[in-house]
UniProtKB/Swiss-Prot annotation:
Domain of life: Bacteria
Native organism: Azoarcus sp. (strain BH72)
Gene responsible for this protein: ubiC
Location of this chain's protein in the cell: Cytoplasm
Catalytic activity: chorismate = 4-hydroxybenzoate + pyruvate
Name under which the protein is recorded: Probable chorismate pyruvate-lyase
Amino acid sequence: MQHPASGESWLARPPRTAERRLRPWLTDPASLTARIRMRCGMFGVRVLRQSAGALTPDERRLLGLRAGERALLREVLLIADGRPVVFARSVLAQREQRGGWLRLWRGIGSRPLGAALFSDPRIRRQPLACARIGAADARYHLARRALAGAATLPPALWARRSVFRLHGRSLLVSEFFLPAILGLPDDPL
């Protein structure tokens, strides 16, 4: 699905142009947090933002929101052995801020969201989509700012996203793979 405003195209599978070592990261439907933890000695989450904010046009479209509708945003860096490996952005529309999602959101703190999502059997994940996100997308610049000069970004980042559903309500989770992800071993430690 092409989104002209940001230039990216979200695909069901990574194209052949995606780096071979990155494809399993883009397509594994299991917990990204668990996958990273199995490949590093120390794992951490650095919360960058957890507040109300505006959405990108493609986030609004995916969640069926009108222009100007706001949402709660959670932006974090996933850290493996002291290196940021993923910039993640979670979106919870204001109209979805009831019940289970709101309790989870308020209580998550600096814990990884993935651990909570995959531990609740009531939560269902919709299929993953992936895209190559470049400088035309605001989220690329959010990732760059989050790194605060700790690493140089390539001209585009591979990302994946999916919607999680709980009692008919949606939470969008997007994960942007930073260059250091390829420094993790292919196989678990």
